[in-house]
């Protein structure tokens, strides 16, 4: 009756060590993502948005020439830059998480492939 179908103690200990290492690396990654500055721009680079690796908005820069374009064009330029920064920030976070977990499929909300 040895084992009772349970993994051996060595395997269990190794699994806990790996989990602790991932947890420590995740904390380090969280800190790295927080201080990252990722730039997104609109098509003509006259609107720029910077976000952290955690998608936290950091700052906005508008080229003075854009200010004479009118409200709708300015809004569209800012929106394009926001989308660009968010896309790069999200893909950076996803890549870093995959590196951290060694490719384990975690199925984190918002991190999966779009349907």
Swiss-Prot record:
Chain segments carrying region Disordered: 89-115
Cellular compartments per GO CC: bacterial nucleoid; cytosol
Main localisation: cytoplasm
S-S bridge residues: none
Keyword RNA-binding: no
Localization terms from the record: Cytoplasm, Nucleoid
Superkingdom of origin: Bacteria
InterPro entries membership: YbaB-like_sf, YbaB/EbfC
GO molecular function: DNA binding
Pfam families listed in its UniProt record: YbaB_DNA_bd
Swiss-Prot/TrEMBL keywords: Cytoplasm, DNA-binding
Protein family: Belongs to the YbaB/EbfC family.
Protein role: Binds to DNA and alters its conformation. May be involved in regulation of gene expression, nucleoid organization and DNA protection.
Subunit structure comment from the entry: Homodimer.
Protein known as: Nucleoid-associated protein NATL1_00191
Organism of this sequence: Prochlorococcus marinus (strain NATL1A)
Upper classification of the organism: Bacteria, Bacillati, Cyanobacteriota, Cyanophyceae, Synechococcales
């Amino acid at each position: 009756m040895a084992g009772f179908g349970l993994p051996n103690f060595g395997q269990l200990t190794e699994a806990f060590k790996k989990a602790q290492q991932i947890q420590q690396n995740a904390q380090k990654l969280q800190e790295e993502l927080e201080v990252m500055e990722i730039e997104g721009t609109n098509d003509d680079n006259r609107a720029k948005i910077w976000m952290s690796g955690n998608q936290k908005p950091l700052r906005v820069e508008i080229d003075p020439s854009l200010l004479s374009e009118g409200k709708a064009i300015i809004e569209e330029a800012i929106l394009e830059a926001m989308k660009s920064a968010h896309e790069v920030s999200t893909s950076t976070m996803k890549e870093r998480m995959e590196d951290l977990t060694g490719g384990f499929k975690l199925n984190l909300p918002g991190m999966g492939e779009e349907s």
